[in-house]
């Protein structure tokens, strides 16, 4: 909504433009009228819409055409004043003023016009019969008001309607020729309906209607008022009410009715509450609220955000199988202007074995990934879902936790983070993709079913360490000789080499020495494809000796060529190293240290599976 309103009064000489302005200010008819009134400003606290309003007078005697054109360009709304007792001034509305104004404004963004019939005290008839055909001819005319500066009739209403034409314009909402709402308005209201339909049954029940009424208008509807609304819809739309709930068709009919009855401020209140601007686009302020992220800090979803996303998942998981089918996912994203997830997402997070559909855990993981890698996009997505409205928060920023500086974690030897990034490094063909897919529980046979164009360079899943659920985010970095700064920023590094390729380990050594040897980032060497015949690596010392020399844990044997899911031991170790980068080399070598971490992972994985089964049974 505009922060202020600028009203320009134009019209033929002596129709009473200046008198109208002066009578509004002084509350009485001026005996002496100057050729032109000075610009006046009405403070926000004395206007119904609480917006400061500037009223500008135009005088043909004192101003030239260039000054008139400038005032037109600055105005938000123009009042064309005519005298009801002067036919010539009425004729000039269409022969002079409307064409002149339209020539000076863009065709796609015409200024709203108010026709003002002044001096109604001098006649006993109305000019409306003459004016109505003009209003029907020009869609930019918002309304017509007959008034009298002399007896103060309707002069306050005149400026109220002018202000309303700017703050609650009819043009973007409604097409008078077709007598129906415009497509952009229907699209916006349809999104609002889908967000408000919290149980996804295609209707707004009484609880949903009351919630909608409260968040938009700050007041609930009385039960009788609710029934009255539904009865109006029933009488006018055959399928506007179903199972005693308001359908989308009924919802759209109500807003059409509001607009037709001149109550378009009601529709605008709803649209603006859900983030729309005057062009029916979601505002940048709504989609991208301010969120300060200091250096060396990361972004995560907080508990309230996860609860919200759980409710969104439940809303669209219609068959209650704890996975979203392609149709269910498409239905979920109907409130988005585009499909945000591509086929690579299915290879980034966990899917079910039946149809390769994104599971409940995979759904939350993808949101966690987006929040960590691109928090602005996460804010945008939460905005499309209506987070701030449904969660009754000021903005989506309240869904985000900004972690503390990593240097503080190192000093205190503990972290509050829940998401840890591991960069997976290795030469092409060494098995990095296998490591990523193994995090999602996929063996080599399942990995071979992935199409090349759907490959993902990220994988994310939960890992349990000492009974704590954490997210491990794996990133397959490029296999170039020199990594970019962005490719070296992480919490832990996984150096992968192929045991069957004699040149594979040497690449890991070069990358380690160039980027990580002098850093405080812990590194773990993974001997991939351990099911194959191991050959001697073409490097001066063996991988085991290299790890010992640089105070790293010994190389971890790994293969995804298994009958069942690959082992998750390396993921527990990587997450543990990321959580406790200060742990000494002696601790890292201790079997007891890893046993405690792995035991916690096993216990909580079992508990998680039991809770998952209970959830399915309960639902």
Curated annotation (Swiss-Prot):
Task: Kindly state one GO CC term assigned in the UniProt record.
Answer: mitochondrial outer membrane
Residue sites binding GTP 2 per the record = 429-434, 448, 529, 531, 559-560
EC numbers for this chain: 3.6.5.-
Q: What is its main location?
A: mitochondrion
The UniProt record gives the binding positions of Mg(2+) 1 as 18, 35, 57
Alphabetical UniProt keywords: Calcium, GTP-binding, Hydrolase, Magnesium, Membrane, Metal-binding, Mitochondrion, Mitochondrion outer membrane, Nucleotide-binding, Repeat, Transmembrane, Transmembrane helix
Provide the membrane topology annotation: Single-pass type IV membrane protein
Q: Where in the cell is it found?
A: Mitochondrion outer membrane
One GO term under biological process is: mitochondrial outer membrane permeabilization
- List positions binding Ca(2+) 1: 197, 199, 201, 203, 208
EC supergroup of this enzyme: hydrolase
The residue ranges of the Miro domain are 2-168, 417-580
The family annotation for this protein states: Belongs to the mitochondrial Rho GTPase family.
Q: How does it assemble?
A: Homodimer.
**UniProt protein name:** Mitochondrial Rho GTPase 1
Q: Which gene encodes it?
A: RHOT1
